[in-house]
Amino acid sequence: MSVQTTKRRLSPASIEALKGERPIVSLTAYTTPIARLLDPHVDFLLVGDSLGMVLYGLDTTVGVTLDMMIAHGQAVMRGSERCCVVVDLPFGAYQESKEQAFRSAARILKETGCSAVKLEGGAEMAETVEFLVSRGIPVLGHVGLMPQLVNTTGGYRSVGRNEKEVAKIRRDAKAIDDAGAFAIVVEGTVEPVAREITATLRAPTIGIGASPACDGQILVSDDMLGLFNDFKPRFVKHFAELAPTISKAAEAYANEVKARSFPGIEHTFQVKR
């Protein structure tokens, strides 16, 4: 009898258990090569619907489809082996009913092999989160600024600037926590409120434009790598400046091709004699 051993990935439960132990590290990934580079350094990779804007040039995430998320989820799973992988439920794939959410989430887990799904929403989505979790689908919540609601909110701006917004964030975070999410992304939320809910929730909070007190942090990898120079959100730090590096590499390549210095003989195949 042979024993087959496979490397165990971090699970949603292991991410949840990190609350109070150490900060949780997360980044987005959409492709196999990037997932392979990030995998050794993060606790979980999020295949975010931000790919619609980052990879496809869409103005918002609303146009992202379930098929797109599954295709990129498969790519990230192929490129990673140790971290937990979470895939976003895109707009229109879960809001209609908890049954629709289950069908979409189950399809993502079955077709990608990922460990969990993420969905945006507060108290109004708590029943859906509980429905999924009770049926074996781990859920990463998402409160605060919710990009999928851009058409009703009128744009992307931080939330928690008045008492009404603060009350809503508190209510949303508690509802998603009580529903059983293993962690909750807190996006674009004023720092004191993000700090407060982090201290009161069972589930770890993952901040993006929130607070250093959050239990973990996430950034869009392309932002972190400095691939976009035209717009830099306040909460983004460039840990590299790859945009000019890539541009210079393309320029050098173009110049060598035009000068016929590339390819050289060393880059060609010869007949063996």
UniProtKB/Swiss-Prot annotation:
GO terms for molecular function: 3-methyl-2-oxobutanoate hydroxymethyltransferase activity; magnesium ion binding. Mg(2+) binds at D49, D88, E120. 3-methyl-2-oxobutanoate binds at D49, S50, D88, K118. It is found in: Cytoplasm. Binds 1 Mg(2+) ion per subunit. One of its GO terms (cellular component) is cytoplasm. It catalyses: 3-methyl-2-oxobutanoate + (6R)-5,10-methylene-5,6,7,8-tetrahydrofolate + H2O = 2-dehydropantoate + (6S)-5,6,7,8-tetrahydrofolate. GO terms for biological process: pantothenate biosynthetic process. Pathway: Cofactor biosynthesis; (R)-pantothenate biosynthesis; (R)-pantoate from 3-methyl-2-oxobutanoate: step 1/2. Its cofactor is Mg(2+). The active site is at E187 (proton acceptor). It comes from the Bacteria. The keyword Magnesium applies. Keywords: Cytoplasm, Magnesium, Metal-binding, Pantothenate biosynthesis, Transferase. Its EC number is 2.1.2.11. CDD domains: KPHMT-like (cd06557). Belongs to the PanB family. Catalyzes the reversible reaction in which hydroxymethyl group from 5,10-methylenetetrahydrofolate is transferred onto alpha-ketoisovalerate to form ketopantoate. HAMAP family: PanB. Homodecamer; pentamer of dimers. This is 3-methyl-2-oxobutanoate hydroxymethyltransferase.
